[in-house]
């Protein structure tokens, strides 16, 4: 019988007699039909002529596939519910796509405080320049008489309410609303004394006393004006203003442009040179104050545009396009759903890169002041997506090894230093300023965590201590994608997160329940697939009686966890199972206590299928059975790739295993050999084009990845030895080598060249290195908790 006819026979249509349900039959038959037709015309050369053993292996593999399909419980359990979930995910994805496509200059909530300053502007006839702003104030008083965000922070409510009362009183409008506002101020002013100063809005200590003075000039009686908390705020203003050299304020743009309405003695002729797009650092209140004093046409046009867009109200800062684009990408990535929006993410990052400068960026394009928070976030995301960015952007934020949020400032925000720390971890070798940034930000964050002071002055979020803690405890090189997503699903507050500017504000395209809902559904879907796969891989372990070779299911679970936490997408099933089974078989074989001669015979039997001398009885039988398990697994993985990808990888996969066995036999670098085996198994299983294997960049990535994986394996072994009383000096030295090698790998993965591999292939090298780093870095307790959390813990 010809090989083609044998294939045609073995790949016969699956029927109900095989115990497979209709949908499963269709899955098998659709693939088998292709290969039957190819076999008939000689279009498939799956095995060498005359090698009937390969035919039998194909048949066994086919039976395994059918059995695996029968074990997929989700095929028989609640198919209707799956359809409902899939439809819901589709609707949510389309909704998010619409949001991302409609990004312009930033979706942001309205600030009553800034709207009040705009409402104070009078036209050339002495009437309100912006009557719709007064109308907005009138229509948006809260039930308790205050104005402000639904999140109650007394600084925010008092500032907004007093500003709105001043605006309405100035135009002699709605006295009853003014009285209700003053009643709220009277009843709540003393609460300022006990509020956390980290929640104080930007510039509050400067603008609030000035607002009180403006109210008093209108005859508004301010309750508790002599209270200790008011005197303290006034003292803070006096101290801050004394530290501000007025000549510097008029000499170059600084962050003080954001709060001009709280300052006196301003020389407007000089300050007008510091406008950007008609505004003073994108602040409507600061720009409105300038317009009152200068009648500048560009300031007027900026405010007209903002008032029109927001229907009378204005936000505390606008535009916020750079901020919105970057933080949106960051949230989508950390939630684990960025793969659904690759096109939109590229468009967003292209937009940011278009306005990127050699000094960094701020929250809006074309600003003349930059901040370290937006710059760090932009640098990190751009670098990770292959854009060419220079570390020189951080120079203006550094002085003597210390880093600040704005040039010349000495205060810090937790999130600012948090983003600096995250960015510093993707440094390339020789980028000293990022090394300094990493040391400084890590020390700062560790100290804040120890002091239980992880409260930010820029955002009120669900679990900032959790976000910072994860970053400190699980460095970027160890942060497996699904592990990060699982933690962030609990830390992300969605719509409830609120930002702190001059007032509290919200960014619906950054903090969105829609993102969170899709992310949870996606995670649950993937987790269900992973749990079913774990059952199937347990069955493989038990059917093969692999426990008899000394390694328990716990080691198998770790191997599967590493694969599922990295190649987590449902469609990557083949890669996951190939990774997990390969890693476990490597560990199982390496754990056998065999002589050099026995290792050679093991490798020979796998390569040639020869029968070993049975004179030593059980030892040889056991080893022969392990060879058989290895051979069958290679055949199974090859067949599954044949069906899924249309590629015959049997010979290549066998050759890859032979290389590893040769290294094992000769006592070579097993960490390096295992990394190469895992990488090539992944690439073969994914159907990677054969030309990629000979690409110069492929060989370069392979060399560096294998080197660092070997270093990590040695480090892991030495760390284990150290725990038993070994020498630790060598471990410290190895760590420096590892970091340098990881930086070398990161540079290869994250930089683009004219003749380059595709990004997905390059990322796979980093993924394997990351898995080695994870097991070397994290202790057993952390790993066990991560496994449970990622694979088995339910999501609320």
Curated annotation (Swiss-Prot):
**Alphabetically ordered keywords of this record:** Chloroplast, Isomerase, Magnesium, Metal-binding, Plastid, Transit peptide
**S-S bridge residues:** none
Q: Where is the transit peptide?
A: 1-23
Q: In which tissues is it expressed?
A: Highly expressed in leaves, and, at low levels, in stems, but barely in roots and flowers.
Q: Where is this motif: DXDD motif?
A: 371-374
A biological process from GO: miltiradiene biosynthetic process
Q: Give the enzyme's EC designation.
A: 5.5.1.13
Q: What class of enzyme is it?
A: isomerase
Cofactor dependence: Mg(2+)
Q: In which pathway does it act?
A: Secondary metabolite biosynthesis; terpenoid biosynthesis
Where does this polypeptide localize? Plastid, Chloroplast
**Major localization listed first in the record, in broad terms:** plastid
- Listed GO MF terms: ent-copalyl diphosphate synthase activity; magnesium ion binding; terpene synthase activity
What reaction does this enzyme carry out catalytically?
(2E,6E,10E)-geranylgeranyl diphosphate = ent-copalyl diphosphate
- Which is a Gene Ontology cellular component entry for this protein? chloroplast
Name the Gene3D superfamilies for this protein: 1.50.10.160, Farnesyl Diphosphate Synthase (1.10.600.10), Terpene synthase, N-terminal domain (1.50.10.130)
Per the record, the similarity remark reads: Belongs to the terpene synthase family. Tpsc subfamily.
Report further notes: Abietane diterpenoids (e.g. miltiradiene, abietatriene and ferruginol) accumulate specifically in the periderm of roots. The ent-kaurene diterpenoid oridonin, main constituent of Isodon rubescens, accumulates in leaves.
Chain's role? Involved in the biosynthesis of ent-kaurene diterpenoids natural products such as oridonin, miltiradiene, eriocalyxin B and nezukol, known to exhibit antitumor, anti-inflammatory and antibacterial activities. Catalyzes the conversion of (2E,6E,10E)-geranylgeranyl diphosphate (GGPP) to ent-copalyl diphosphate (ent-CPP).
Entry note about domains: The Asp-Xaa-Asp-Asp (DXDD) motif is important for the catalytic activity, presumably through binding to Mg(2+).
* Protein name in UniProt: Ent-copalyl diphosphate synthase 4
């Amino acid at each position: 019988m010809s090989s083609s006819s044998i294939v045609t026979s073995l790949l016969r249509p699956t029927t109900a007699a095989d115990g497979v349900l209709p949908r499963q039959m269709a899955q098998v038959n659709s693939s088998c039909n292709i290969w039957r037709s190819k076999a008939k015309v000689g279009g498939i050369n799956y095995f060498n002529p005359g090698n009937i053993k390969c035919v039998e292996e194909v048949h066994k593999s086919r039976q395994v596939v059918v059995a695996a399909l029968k074990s997929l419980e989700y095929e028989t359990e609640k198919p209707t519910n799956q359809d409902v979930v899939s439809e819901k995910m589709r609707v949510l994805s389309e909704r998010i796509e619409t949001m991302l496509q409609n990004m312009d200059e930033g979706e942001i909530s309205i600030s009553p405080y800034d709207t009040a300053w705009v409402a104070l502007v009078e036209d050339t006839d002495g009437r309100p320049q912006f009557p719709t702003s007064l109308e907005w104030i009138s229509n948006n008083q809260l039930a308790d008489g205050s104005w402000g965000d639904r999140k109650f922070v007394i600084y925010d409510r008092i500032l907004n309410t007093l500003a709105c009362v001043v605006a309405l009183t100035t135009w002699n409008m709605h006295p009853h609303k003014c009285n209700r506002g003053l009643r709220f101020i009277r009843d709540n002013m003393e609460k300022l004394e006990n509020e956390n100063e980290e929640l104080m809005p930007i510039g509050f200590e400067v603008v609030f006393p000035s607002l009180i003075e403006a109210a008093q000039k209108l005859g508004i009686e301010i309750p508790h004006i002599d209270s200790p908390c008011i005197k303290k705020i006034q003292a803070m203003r006096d101290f801050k203003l004394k530290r501000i050299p007025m000549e510097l304020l008029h000499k170059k743009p600084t962050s003080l442009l954001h709060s001009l309405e709280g300052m006196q003695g301003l020389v407007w002729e000089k300050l007008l040179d510091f406008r950007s797009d008609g505004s003073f650092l994108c602040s409507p209140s600061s720009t409105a104050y300038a317009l009152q004093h200068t009648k500048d046409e560009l300031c007027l046009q900026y405010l007209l545009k903002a008032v029109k867009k927001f229907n009378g109200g204005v936000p505390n800062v606008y535009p916020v396009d750079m901020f919105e684009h970057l933080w949106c990408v960051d949230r989508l990535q950390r939630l684990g759903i960025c793969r659904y929006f690759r096109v939109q993410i590229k468009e967003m990052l292209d937009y940011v890169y278009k306005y990127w400068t050699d000094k960094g960026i701020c929250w809006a394009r074309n600003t003349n002041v930059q901040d370290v928070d937006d710059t760090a976030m932009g640098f990190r995301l751009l670098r990770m997506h292959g854009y060419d960015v220079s570390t020189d952007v951080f120079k203006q934020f550094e002085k003597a090894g210390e880093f600040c949020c704005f040039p010349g400032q000495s205060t810090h925000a937790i999130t600012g230093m948090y983003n600096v720390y995250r960015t510093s971890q993707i440094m390339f070798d020789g980028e000293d300023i990022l090394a300094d940034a990493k040391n400084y930000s890590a020390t700062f964050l560790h100290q804040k965590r120890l002091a239980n002071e992880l409260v930010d002055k820029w955002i009120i979020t669900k679990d900032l201590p959790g976000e910072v803690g994860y970053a400190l405890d699980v460095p970027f090189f160890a942060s497996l994608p699904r592990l990060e997503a699982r933690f962030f699903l609990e830390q992300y507050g969605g719509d409830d997160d609120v930002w702190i500017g001059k007032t509290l504000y919200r960014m619906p395209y950054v903090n969105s329940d829609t993102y969170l809902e899709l992310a949870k559904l996606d995670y649950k879907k993937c987790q269900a697939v992973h749990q079913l796969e774990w059952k199937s891989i347990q069955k493989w372990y038990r059917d093969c009686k692999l426990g008899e070779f000394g390694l328990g299911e716990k080691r198998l679970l770790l191997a599967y966890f590493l694969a599922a936490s990295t190649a987590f997408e449902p469609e990557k099933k083949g890669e996951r199972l190939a990774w997990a089974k390969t890693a476990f078989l490597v560990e199982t074989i390496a754990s056998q206590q065999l002589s050099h001669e026995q290792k050679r015979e093991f490798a020979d039997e796998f390569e040639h299928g020869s029968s070993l001398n049975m004179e030593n009885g059980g030892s040889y039988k056991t080893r022969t059975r392990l060879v058989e398990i290895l051979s069958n697994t290679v055949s199974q993985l090859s067949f599954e790739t044949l069906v899924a990808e249309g590629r015959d990888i049997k010979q290549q996969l066998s050759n890859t295993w032979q290389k590893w066995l040769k290294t094992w036999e000769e006592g070579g670098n097993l960490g390096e050999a295992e990394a190469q085996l895992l990488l090539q198994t992944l690439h073969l299983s994914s159907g990677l084009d054969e030309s990629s294997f000979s690409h110069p960049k492929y060989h370069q990535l392979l060399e560096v990845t294998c080197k660092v994986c070997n270093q990590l394996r040695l480090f892991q072994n030495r760390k284990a030895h150290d725990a038993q009383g070994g020498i630790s000096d060598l471990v410290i030295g190895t760590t420096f080598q590892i970091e340098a090698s990881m930086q070398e790998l990161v540079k290869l993965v994250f930089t683009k060249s004219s003749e380059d591999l595709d990004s997905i292939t390059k990322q796979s090298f980093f993924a394997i290195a990351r898995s080695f780093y994870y097991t070397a870095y994290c202790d057993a307790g952390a790993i066990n908790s991560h496994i449970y959390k990622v694979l088995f813990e339910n999501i609320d």
